[in-house]
């Protein structure tokens, strides 16, 4: 995997804008949340 990556802890409604901004900047988003149904998990490149 080439390119820059970012890890965002939490995928709730408050983290969705941060995930989207990171993706708009061309970053590969790795998102961690215990809730697999959190909204940010659907837009992350690699949800954990």
Q: Model segments located where?
A:
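ATP-binding N-terminal substructure of ATP-dependent carboxylate-amine bond-forming enzymes
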Residues: 1-48
């Amino acid at each position: 995997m080439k390119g820059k990556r970012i890890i965002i802890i939490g995928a709730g409604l408050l983290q969705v804008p941060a995930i989207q901004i990171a993706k708009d900047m061309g970053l590969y988003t790795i998102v961690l949340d215990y809730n697999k149904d959190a909204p940010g998990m659907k837009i992350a490149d690699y949800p954990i």
